[in-house]
Amino acid sequence: MAAKDVKFGIDARNKMLRGVNVLADAVKVTLGPKGRNVVLDKSFGAPVITKDGVSVAREIELEDKFENMGAQMVKEVASKANDAAGDGTTTATVLAQAIIAEGLKAVAAGMNPMDLKRGIDKAVVGAVEELKKLSVPCSDTKAIAQVGTISANSDETVGTLIAQAMEKVGKEGVITVEEGTGLEDELDVVEGMQFDRGYLSPYFINKPETGTAELENPFILLVDKKVSNIRELLPVLEGVAKANKPLLIIAEDVEGEALATLVVNNMRGIVKVAAVKAPGFGDRRKAMLQDIAILTNGTVISEEIGMELEKATLEDLGQAKRVVINKDTTTIIDGLGEQEAISGRVAQIRQQIEDATSDYDREKLQERVAKLAGGVAVIKVGAATEVEMKEKRARVDDALHATRAAVEEGVVAGGGTALVRVANALREMTGDNEEQTVGIRVALRAMEAPMRQIVANAGEEPSVVVNDVKAGQGNYGYNAATEAYGDMIEMGILDPTKVTRSALQFAASIAGLMITTEAMVTDLPKDEKMDLGAAGGMGGMGGMGGMM
């Protein structure tokens, strides 16, 4: 086991604080509408230019191991805020730095760190309650666009695109961000249920100009097994032919004789038909087939529940207004399912989302809800260069998360105003003893730090602005973009309550742990001389050239 280097008390805390300051100082220059860029060197390719706090934090690794521990703990604050709300990483870092710096001063003055931490925790609980009181619901398109704009660093086109996407696919809809091919940002909305399985044979194509198979008012047969024997399909095919409607078959697979017969029937015009594989695998496939059945008012033909394909009738088939199939995807538009059944299914999946333990499962379940309830929107980010594309995509992702958070828990006045109001409301709060009260004061003073940093980045004097805002009431704050005072919500400067709350809670949590740190342990650096000494005896090999 390698020897360890141990530091105690004030030495340990000072080293840790130095690391915190290096990371936080690099991150906080990006805060606010007039925040600066940070350039990150990459081992290959062009440097990355970013205004995204968490991207800057992730790149920072310090040489001194004790300082690095401090930096890594604050990096954790940014990551946690990013995971919880998708934004607010820079705010969380600024808050953490302020609480740690003030807290360590109090510890150096001889205060009990545990009581300080209790005071900080008490202030945060009170602050979260105050934030809830200040929060305003965010439901209209204009407010959603404003939140998106602020989070995308005042890029109005991004805010508007996200608002349009949410309007089209609903609050629950899936919105994904992709890299586009042009210079302009685009919004692509897929209505209805789309899954990533294409036609099983190109002979099903009936629109050669678009390379798609399109079926109008089709019956939809859902089968939870492989179909290879055409005899099993004959009763359904005959019924569909009599009804003079097209047929879509969604099965685990359709192969051999069954597929060949379907192709021949389709080409001869006897029955207009197309076949695709069912989406997903294993239990997820069964669940998704059931989703499609509910959406189209059909029944999944499954031997597990004693149903045989040969005995299927037209009553077992689902129906939709239209189905479009290309080589990669199938889209079912306007399924004829009953709204009540669809709502029940959505509620059931939402319950599963709450119980899910892994992010992957949660994401897949969320997609299923979106496909049943709304649709899927794709925002294609346009840019002139690769470097700009990466930077812009990160901003759009942030903005999307922020708008989701805003819809979830509402919005508060932006620009750090809400936290200043909260600190003002709690100024009479006291702890169980004097040291807890000092902890409360540390947290309340730190709540002014985001506004101070936004103002400093805009080139103004932070103390003057903070005092002016404190003198005001409600949503009165300072708009750093226009250098004007006024009602922040009316000016469209909004922050999602969830983002502000998460930033404060995570910052206080990690800062509290760091204030109560008394010792730090790390590996001693290895002695390089020893390693070189072992190879020293090889020096004489140079003379072997004469032996050739």
From Swiss-Prot:
It catalyses: ATP + H2O + a folded polypeptide = ADP + phosphate + an unfolded polypeptide. The keyword ATP-binding applies. Keywords: ATP-binding, Chaperone, Cytoplasm, Isomerase, Nucleotide-binding. It is found in: Cytoplasm. One of its GO terms (molecular function) is ATP binding. NCBIfam families: GroEL, PRK00013.1, PRK12849.1, PRK12850.1, PRK12851.1. This is Chaperonin GroEL. The gene is groEL.
